[in-house]
Design a protein with these regions (language model features):
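Catalytic phosphate/metal-binding cores of nucleic-acid and nucleotide-processing enzymes, i.e., regions
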Residues: 2-5, 17, 21-34, 48, ...
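Active-site nucleotide-donor binding segment shared across nucleotidyl transfer reactions
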Residues: 37
Length: 140
């Protein structure tokens, strides 16, 4: 099993993943909406979910407030596991962080100001946001 990642390691990995090819973002072109899983792509949180959850054919918009919807529609809730959390749904190496980290990472993914899609690159604002996140989450 891979070691648990720090907040900054997760931020760096996420930034590198989408900076290499912003088309990997799980965004519907004509609406700009983000979905956890869309046409083989995953949002920032969706990318870190365990295989069971990544395989869900659920078209939720990609933000942490919708995780509760995802939990309510799964078999854990049906067998009395209403206490399931985002942390439970993540691959083990991503577990152990507060939801605020995931909101921050998801917002990096979602914000169109951070991605120059016609030129397939990160914008100056996007890189600045990444640097701010790295400072804010250092040591966590």
């Amino acid at each position: 099993m891979k070691k648990k990642m720090t907040a900054c390691e997760i931020i760096q990995e996420t930034y590198n993943y989408y900076a290499k090819d912003p088309e990997r973002r799980s965004v519907i072109r004509n609406t700009g909406n983000c979905l956890y899983n869309y046409e083989g792509r995953h949002c920032a949180i969706g990318r870190c979910l365990s295989l069971k959850w990544r395989k869900q054919d659920i078209m939720f918009r990609g933000n942490t407030s919708n995780i509760s919807d995802m939990v309510l529609k799964n078999d854990y809730a049906e067998i009395g596991r209403e206490d399931l959390t985002l942390n439970d749904m993540l691959m083990p190496r991503y577990r152990g962080h507060i939801d605020d980290l995931w909101e921050d990472i998801q917002n990096l993914h979602d914000n169109c100001r951070y991605w120059d899609m016609p030129n397939n690159r990160v914008t100056t604002d996007g890189h600045g946001r990444f640097e701010t996140m790295m400072r804010n989450w250092e040591g966590v």
